Every structure is written in C-alpha cells, then in structure tokens.
Amino acid sequence: MQRRKFVEMGAVCALALTAALPARAEAERPILVAASFDAMAELVKAVGGSLVRVETLIPPGAEPHDFTPTVKTTQLLRAASVLVVNGFGMEPWAKKIAAAAENPRLMLVTASEGAVSVKNSDPDEIAEHGADDPHLWLSLSGAEIEARNIAEALAKADPKNAEAYRMQFTLFKGKLHVLKTQYSARFRNVKRRFFVPATPLLLISAGTSILSRRAWKAFSQRENPRRSGSQSLQSS
C-alpha cells in the first residue's frame, strides 16, 4: 500500500531534521505521548525532543485502517497526556479509543487540522480510503502544518515547557524552508520536467510549478509496473 511505502520515508526525514531540546531535570519525567503511526511519532520527536516519550500505537508495516486496539493500547492511553493522529480519515477509530481509555487528561490532536487536502484521483484509492489523500506529512508544507499543531498541543499539555516546544518548532520550520529552497533550485534547471509519483503529495514536495505530472497507479507495493506503462514512460 502507498501508506506503508512512505511512512518510513517520512520518519527518516523527520529524524534528520530533529534538533536537540534542553534535557529535563533528572527528577522531572518527560510527558508520555501516543502517536498513531511512525510518521506522527517522528514529528512529535522533532518538536518534543527529550521533553517527550513517544509510543506508537500501530506496528511498523501495519495499515492504520486495519488497526485493532488491544488491552495494551488502552493501558497506554490511560497513561498518556496526548494522542496524536494524522486525520483525513486515516484513523477513523481515534475518538472511540480515546473515549474508551477514560483518561480525562488525554488530549486528542489531529495533526492535519487546518490543512487543505489533496484529492485522490485514483478510483481504487477513493473506494478504499475516501476522497482525501491523507499523506500530508510527505509535503514540506504539510509537515510544517502538522508539526505546528503538535507543538501547540504539547505546549498545552505541558505548559511549563511551552516556549521550548515552540522554539523547537521554529527550528524545524526553518530547516523545512531550507530544504524547499534547495529542491526548488535543483529542479529549476531540469530540462526534462517529468515526474512519476506514487502519491500526488510527492509532487507538492518536489514543486508542482516546475514539474509536469503523469501519475501512474502501477507504482505501489501491491502492483507491478505494467509493460505497456513502462514502455510509455520510457518513450516520454
């Protein structure tokens, strides 16, 4: 599936961008944050650093929509201060498991809040996942929105360190902007402006204004590229 393919990419990017926060005093424990899957966990680490301890609900490689909560899930959420989910229909079970935890301190945060979704154009994807492409974290601007929402949630859950979370977000945002500038400069002089994305959001990361798009749905983990499609790409 597309999500499975790109969660690791998003995680690596977030880790590479993370800067260190000042460590807590030895007697002060980091707040516990539950994240729905790896990409959300890495964004939490990017703005939370040593001030947070992050636990992921969905095992690596598993699909969010196939997730079934366990007793361990409930125990984790009863102890957590924040639950971070992506949204855009990726975790339809989020509100239910948050309520089941019966933890009045638990703050449910939808990282994509305020973002405008990219619409799915593949009929199979629409039938399976809905009209919105949920892979917001793959876009540099999308990652910025999600990181900001997470930082603000952490600031509310841990007000003593609110400024530290906001400072870390500012650093993270600056590095995202540097990456965007670098990629824009590299693509500006590309003569053959042709790009095959496995998800439309990769076009946003690359810069849609300077690349032409030919999305090819055979580029996914569950499908092998068709010979006719491959020949078409080679001749482009």
Give the ranges of each region predicted by the language model:
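Bacterial N-terminal signal peptides
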Residues: 10-18
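Extracytoplasmic metal-acquisition and chelation regions
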Residues: 2-3, 8-11, 25-236
